From Swiss-Prot:
It is found in: Cytoplasm. Keywords: Cytoplasm, Hydrolase, Nuclease, Ribosome biogenesis. This is Putative pre-16S rRNA nuclease. One of its GO terms (cellular component) is cytosol. The keyword Hydrolase applies. It comes from Synechococcus sp. (strain JA-3-3Ab).
Length: 159
């Protein structure tokens, strides 16, 4: 498992896929071609690990992803709990199945942020339930994109 903020795509255009892996659903988000903005794309209904991986591979092909970013639900103190261990198992299976970087980020409070984002956008409460997983994936991916951009800009030489 790695949080690789310095990953730079060698293929054009840049395309990152973000995943919020839950017990029942996997939220999916994608980046724009510049790696600036994340947008929720959809949801994968979980069935079995091989089927889930196949569905993620389909999203990778569809989006021509150059990197996959998966949120790890660490506990408030940063430690790994039972849900994080489940997601880590998923990440290992995904890494074995795809030929591109799979990186992880701490997704602590991503669902809270996603709920707030949906409320601020004026999405009715009933409609939020259908969108929360993909919005959480977008929050996870946006976190990685922002950290990556900040990391790259802080390494730029001062002029």
């Amino acid at each position: 498992m790695s949080t690789d903020l310095n990953y730079s795509a060698t293929r054009d255009p840049f395309s990152a896929l973000g995943l919020d892996v839950g017990n029942r659903r996997i939220g999916v988000a994608g980046s724009d071609g510049l790696g600036l903005l994340a947008t929720g794309l959809g949801v994968i209904r979980r069935r079995s690990l091989p089927e889930d991986i196949a569905q993620v591979q389909a999203w990778i092909r569809r989006r021509q992803a150059t990197v996959v970013v998966v949120g790890i639900p660490l506990l408030a103190d940063g430690s790994v709990g039972s849900q994080a261990r489940k997601v880590q198992r998923f990440v290992r299976a995904l890494q074995a199945a795809v030929d591109l970087p799979v990186v992880t980020v701490n997704e602590y409070l991503s669902t809270v942020q996603a709920e707030w984002d949906l409320r601020q956008a004026g999405i009715p409460a009933k409609a939020q339930k259908a969108l929360i997983d993909q919005q959480s994936a977008a929050v996870i991916l946006q976190t990685w994109l922002d950290e990556r951009r900040y990391s790259q800009s802080s390494k730029a030489p001062c002029r």
